[in-house]
From Swiss-Prot:
Its main location: endoplasmic reticulum. Residues 230-240 have a biased composition (Acidic residues). Keywords: Carbohydrate metabolism, Endoplasmic reticulum, Glycoprotein, Membrane, Signal, Transmembrane, Transmembrane helix. The gene is Mlec. It comes from Rattus norvegicus. A carbohydrate binds at residues 81, 103, 130-131, 200. This is Malectin. InterPro entries: Malectin_dom, MLEC.
């Protein structure tokens, strides 16, 4: 049994250690406690299928391994016309994912086997590297017969030689595929189709499917021009009769999830050391009282 002074010294030392732990920056505290902190951790393992359309195999900055296009020599045509251009919104290391593409004069697509049920996200990567105005290339994207992207005009969305991601969440449960409010029978495979429209040919630069939600998907770098356009669309208007404010909301597919609130994670990480402090301090105090 510890002597009173020794027990008191041990308790003081423990409290100092816990106080120091509370004062550490969140990233260091989480690392020391073994708490998963970095966003995107485990992302490569959650990706079940990824293809660099029209290009060679590539591992991106997040560790996702994009395989060489399996449609090479079978369907459509590969193009590396975009290799002449820098791609905005993309990191230099991953511009290759937007500089090559596969297109076809008719509807074409990819077939992806999915063995397990759960929540998934389809991420489609595009960049317009040829046309310099809108209404030149417009097409739809279908997933197992569901139109998940309607009238996609890449130039109209983000401009020329600029990366654009379409992010489509879905769930597979009890033999059913649920996507964008629609449900269909699922037979073990996802069919991703790029549908020929009235304006030029459908295409895709890269694509992948991952287990998870849209919050798990890495987002592209900010696009100042696009942000300004969205702000203008959301400006407040006034009704002439009542002067009531209303907000105009365009039903647009965003090119990535919202930035997570950093303070939300900070609060959760603070709770762990506080609980540890109480859990250790109370038994120590009890031992001191018995002395």
């Amino acid at each position: 049994m510890l002597k009173p002074r020794a027990a008191e010294g041990a308790a003081v030392a423990l409290l100092r250690l816990l106080l120091l732990l509370l004062l550490l920056p969140p990233e260091l505290r989480d690392r020391g406690l073994g708490v998963a902190g970095a966003a995107g951790a485990g992302l490569p393992e959650s990706v079940i299928w990824a293809v660099n359309a029209g290009g060679e195999a590539h591992v991106d900055v997040h560790g996702i391994h994009f395989r060489k296009d399996p449609l090479e020599g079978r369907v459509g045509r590969a193009s590396d016309y975009g290799m002449k251009l820098p791609i905005l919104r993309s990191t230099p290391e991953d511009q290759i994912l937007y500089q090559t593409e596969r297109y076809n004069e008719e509807t074409f697509g990819y077939e992806v086997p999915v063995k397990e049920e759960g929540d998934y996200v389809l991420v489609l990567k595009f960049a317009e590297v040829y046309f310099a105005q809108s209404q030149q290339k417009v097409f739809d994207v279908r997933l197992n017969g569901h139109v998940v992207v309607k009238d996609l005009d890449i130039f109209d969305r983000v401009g020329h030689s600029t990366a654009h991601d379409e992010i489509i969440p879905m769930s597979i449960r009890k033999g059913k595929l649920s996507v964008q409010g629609e449900v269909s029978t699922f037979t073990g495979k996802l069919y991703i189709e790029f549908v020929k429209g009235y304006y030029d040919n459908p295409k895709v630069c890269a694509l992948y499917i991952m287990a998870g939600t849209v919050d798990d998907v890495p987002k592209l770098q900010p696009h100042p021009g696009l942000e300004k356009k969205e702000e203008e669309e959301e400006e407040e208007e006034y009704d002439e009769g009542s002067n009531l404010k209303r907000q105009t909301n365009k039903n647009r597919v965003q090119s990535g999830p919202r930035t997570p609130n950093p303070y939300a994670s900070d609060n959760s990480s603070l709770m762990f050391p506080i609980l540890v402090a109480f859990g250790v301090f109370i038994p120590t105090l009890f031992c001191l009282c018995r002395l």
